[in-house]
Amino acid sequence: MEPDFWHSKWNAEQIGFHLNEVNPLLIKYWPALDLAPNSQVFVPLCGKSLDLCYLAELGHKVVGCELNQTAVEQFFAENSLPHLMTPAKESISELNRFDASDITLYQGDLFSLTPEELSGVDAFYDRAALIAWPESMRLAYVEKLIELLPPKSMGLLVTLDYPQEALKGPPFAVSNDWVMANMADYFELELLSSEDVLNENPRFVNKQVPWLTESVYQLKRRG
């Protein structure tokens, strides 16, 4: 999606994708990665997710990237986190940087993020990034993720799948076949769960979407 689309959603407070709790799937499946507490975790398209705080509470150093500055500012304000903001013009980065004790957020275009800015990353968590891209842009995101993540890094990926013609995304439908066809060359993939969650999502029910499958994958970057 174009940046203006996401900025307009935040400006209008149309953020149905935001959860007001830690994602239960993160709580359930993150321990399977068996990471050291001080591991550094990358969270792309993080919004103001409470998952960032949860990961930090586990002892991880969390690095997120979010396009919209309002989302970043709300995250720190709503969680009462003192932070330091470094504008892009005052650093070598093309993104604004917000630093709290265990959480760093880069604000700006994900595609401007560099591997150097993620040096030290051991893991990643994608709940709402892959499904935020229409199919025409999705592969470019995967290629960027591959560029940013070092070999052997572990990750958790959450996807949604449904008949795309039944509803205009985002979130967009991402099938298991798409994940395997486009990511298996770069990641070892293990499907941890796949469940129908239609009844838990009124928007999809109201649009008469016939089914909605939420899947969780464990990934390991090849190399």
Curated annotation (Swiss-Prot):
EC number from the UniProt entry: 2.1.1.67
A biological-process GO annotation: methylation
PROSITE patterns reported in the protein's UniProt record: SAM_MT_TPMT (PS51585)
Main location: cytoplasm
Pfam families: TPMT
Matches recorded under Gene3D superfamilies: Vaccinia Virus protein VP39
Disulfide bonds: none
Name of the protein described by the UniProt record: Thiopurine S-methyltransferase
The encoding gene: tpm
